[in-house]
Amino acid sequence: MESSSNSDQNEGTPTSSVSSPYRRTYSDISGLSHRFDVQSFYNRPSNTNAVVLSGHEEDVSEDAEEPKDDVVNDVHGDGDEEDSDIDSAEDAELEMMRERFAKLLLGEDMSGSGKGVCTAVTVSNSITNLYATVFGQSLRLQPLSTEKKDLWKREMNCFMSICDYIVEVIPRSLGTNVEITETKLRSDILMSLPALRKLDNMLMEILDSFTENEFWYVERGSSSMNSGGGGRDSGTFRKVVVQRKDEKWWLPVPCVPAEGLSEEERKHLRHKRDCASQIHKAALAINDSTLNDMDIPDSYLTTLPKSGKASVGDVIYKQLCTAEKFYPDQLLDILKITSEHEALELADKVEASLVTWRRKTGGLTHSKSSWDMMKDISGDADRGNDKNHILAARARSLLFCLKQRYPELSQTSLDICKIQFNRDVGKAVLESYSRVLEGLAYNVVSWIDDVLYVDRTVRNRDD
Amino acid sequence: MFDGRNSGHSSFSSRGDGMHTPEHELAGHAAPSTRRGKQNRRSDMEVMKERFAKLLLGEDMSGGGTGETSALALSNAITKLADSMFGEQMKLQPMYPETKENWRKEMGWLLSVIDHIVQFVPSRQMGKNGQFTEIMVTKQRDDLLTNIPALRKLDSVLLETLDNFKDQKDFWYVPRDMEDADHNGDWRRDENWWLPVVKVPTDGLSEESRRWLQNQKDSVAQVLKAATAINAHVLSEMHVPENYIDSLPKNGKTSLGDFLYKSITEESFDPDYFVSFLDLSTEHKVLDLKNRIEASMVIWKRKMCQKEKDGKSQWGSTVSLEKRELFEVRAETILVMLKQQFPGIPQSSLEVSKIKNNKDVGQAILESYSRVLESLASKIMSRIEDVLEADRLVQRQLMGEAETRSESEAESEYEETEKVVAAETPNSRKLSDFIGWRLSSDTKKHSSMSDIEFFHKVEQEKEKPMMKSPRALPKKFSYLAKLENMRSPSDRH
């Protein structure tokens, strides 16, 4: 009974898609030409005990290395570092940073004519693209290569250093009659940026912890998969390759020994999964907070229909209107959402209605931020009887519930619009950094779930 | 939608990166060859981070996105860097090594942005089968390819000129207060109150020194001419901002005022005669005149464009197309003459507006770099002129003291010297400047008409040599001295 329930819950998770930033790397993945080492697989010594298979892990990112990284690699490889090597490396670093900054100033416009996007959007795009470059081909539970790790740290430091100069001027008293002004790091940056750095480091540590795994991977479509299947029947090989669901066609297939993973390994995996899950929640919270703080662009407001009912549709509108008490969970159950695409469509509609109803109450002045909007809803208890207020409050709770139920929902139309029109550099860094960490954390959780799923399948089959 | 947009940018950027190779690395652009400690290297990194971060924020510390565009931020950064490097250069002596190093390093950072401003051009590539295939390769934008190396060269020449004054003994400087104590009176112009006083030996400079100083001055004059030409060209390429156009009156007459309008629209027009009647006694008045003339030119140009576009009949207008074009040419002639006579004049409203509203990063760098080099060249010329003037003063005293010389003979010699100076300098500068300016003219017709005006002016000049020289020289010195303040758009301060 209990095991059956767990099985149902876990089966649901693998069907979720990866985060939106991750999807941009499809074309890169389809180009992969790495093949599993068949000879090595067949020659593996056969014995009844589990053997660590780290030798079979292929670092698919090696081919993607740039010549520049070799310089850094050489320096790290030297046991006895000489001054000239250090100078050379640091000159190279200075040069790379200068190039990065120069391109940021052009706003992705190589003609230099000023048609590029503004700095905030440039920085946001750069962080997103850097993430795709570094993690786009990282599809397994294994440490990141040294070159990729250094690239990530170096470039993120470049982007984050911009935030060091975003300050606010505050008065400070030096005594009874003397007061001066001093600069302090802007409060949202002061709070969130160190947190994101911490989450980043934790994720790196999780990946670093997967060095001596009991599980290994094969590429989908590899001939060894079919051979393995045949081998089982013939009794020659004892390894089992579990066919995975088609939804993740691009991911390599995790494999475990015939008797399953050891209890120790299983415990390790569950622990890392919990950590990654916590990181995902934290990154998501920071991302939501930053997005909520961004102004609603005029171009979004002008596209809204005149009534909230038109956005959300009759069925949902009726539910929001008539119920004495509103239970968003029940409404979501009734709606029977079958895909993430449907969930996203619903989120867009509910959000549009929310903004519309908020405007009608007069609480939403020109480009007011969402936070202020939220505060207005909770603060105006006296006007609780107003219809639009009730509708707005219920729409908000429905949206919140929807996001909880689908944690890896893509960005809504409003989110995308805010990011595109945002001019605040600090918010651009916070939003994009938290978003990519959110995506990476979610991926790690998914990959661990995949391994645990295969393990359960193997052990159930044996029983 | 957002995802697709990012993908597009990503692939485009990647392709550009792969194709682009930095071809224009110059000596001044390279990292210092001497080895330096880890401390200094780290410091370089931190300074560069700060410089670029502030540029990216558009000098808006709150990060809210209300800062300037990258183009304007870069322009301001170059202007401020030059001011901090050269603002204290009040003597003819080499820059401090540390200051020079900082100038080269930080300008290197700012100029590195142009390494990534490219255009795509077709190129033929030999395939493996021996067949040629046409592919697109990146090449630096044409205006940058031409002008950045030139500006770098002018930069080097100016710094070398200052280096040439190392260990010189022919003249020296004393603080102003010491000089005042000695003389109990000030023979210097008030405009230079903050400058140290240059001193020469009691018997004046040697002939060799005098010749050498003149040679240095000529060299810097060439730099000034070239930098001015590049700056004028870049400014002419910039778009006239809409908000400048919106602020204009409806017709040229209103902008010029009745007197100017009537003079320019007379049947016969003599630019020299016209200029001689203008009140050019203060810098403010010259600038105001410049603004009015430029405004009327923009108005007339726009009306001509509109007329050609509308296909409207000429007879329906108050002023015919040909006449308006003639007026514009005359206005331009006066403008050129003003710029020759007052090279140190602050930028006009149109120029300030163009710089502030420009979004082209390449143009921003070209304009600001040429402008700061122009200012530095003018400053060096003024300093050399001060030395030559001190020498002339001593020479005059010596001549006055000579008993064996007759009074008339001395005066005669002085007059001849003045004539030579007056005849040579204005002519050579005007001639080359005028021809250089013509190259940036919009249409051939304008050039043709201007040539006629130009030859007419030369004839006039030959007939009245004495009238011109006494008036021009004092004003020239007066305004050259004002170049102590680094030129930049006035609104920015």
UniProtKB/Swiss-Prot annotation, chain A:
Tissue-wise expression: Expressed in root vascular tissue and trichoblast cell files. Expressed in root metaxylem cell files. Expressed in guard cells of cotyledons, rosette leaves, sepals, petal, stigmas and siliques. Expressed in root metaxylem cell files.
InterPro entries reported for this sequence: PRONE_dom, RopGEF
KW Cell membrane (keyword) present: yes
Gene Ontology MF terms: guanyl-nucleotide exchange factor activity
Pfam families in the cross-refs: PRONE
Result of knocking out the encoding gene: No visible phenotype under normal growth conditions, but mutant plant roots have reduced density of secondary wall pits in metaxylem vessels.
UniProt feature, compositional bias: Basic and acidic residues: 69-78
A GO CC term assigned to this protein in UniProt: apical plasma membrane
Biological processes annotated in GO: defense response to fungus; plant-type cell wall organization; root hair elongation
PRONE domain segment(s): 84-463
Stretches with biased composition (Acidic residues): 59-68
Keywords: Cell membrane, Cytoplasm, Guanine-nucleotide releasing factor, Membrane, Stress response
Main subcellular location of this protein, as a coarse class: cytoplasm
Region spans: Disordered: 1-25, 55-87
Subcellular localization(s) per the UniProt record: Cytoplasm; Cell membrane
Highest rank taxon of the organism: Eukaryota
Record has ATP-binding as a keyword: no
Quaternary state and interactors: Interacts with ARAC10/ROP11.
Protein's job: Guanine-nucleotide exchange factor (GEF) that acts as an activator of Rop (Rho of plants) GTPases by promoting the exchange of GDP for GTP. In association with ROPGEF1, acts as a specific regulator of ARAC10/ROP11 function in ABA-mediated stomatal closure.
Additional facts recorded: Plants overexpressing ROPGEF1 or ROPGEF4 are relatively insensitive to ABA-induced stomatal closure and become severely wilted during drought stress. A similar phenotype is observed in plants expressing a constitutively active ARAC10/ROP11.
Domain text: The PRONE (plant-specific Rop nucleotide exchanger) domain is responsible for the GEF activity.
Protein name (record): Rop guanine nucleotide exchange factor 4
Species the sequence originates in: Arabidopsis thaliana
Swiss-Prot record, chain B:
Gene3D superfamilies: PRONE domain, subdomain 1, PRONE domain, subdomain 2
Domain (PRONE) ranges: 35-401
GO CC entries: apical plasma membrane
A Gene Ontology molecular function term of the record: guanyl-nucleotide exchange factor activity
Record region (Disordered): 1-45, 400-423
Biased composition (Basic and acidic residues): 17-27
KW Aminoacyl-tRNA synthetase (keyword) present: no
The keyword Ribosomal protein belongs to this UniProt entry's keyword annotation: no
Keywords annotated in UniProt: Guanine-nucleotide releasing factor
Function: Guanine-nucleotide exchange factor (GEF) that acts as an activator of Rop (Rho of plants) GTPases by promoting the exchange of GDP for GTP.
Record's protein name: Rop guanine nucleotide exchange factor 10
Source species of the chain: Arabidopsis thaliana (Mouse-ear cress)
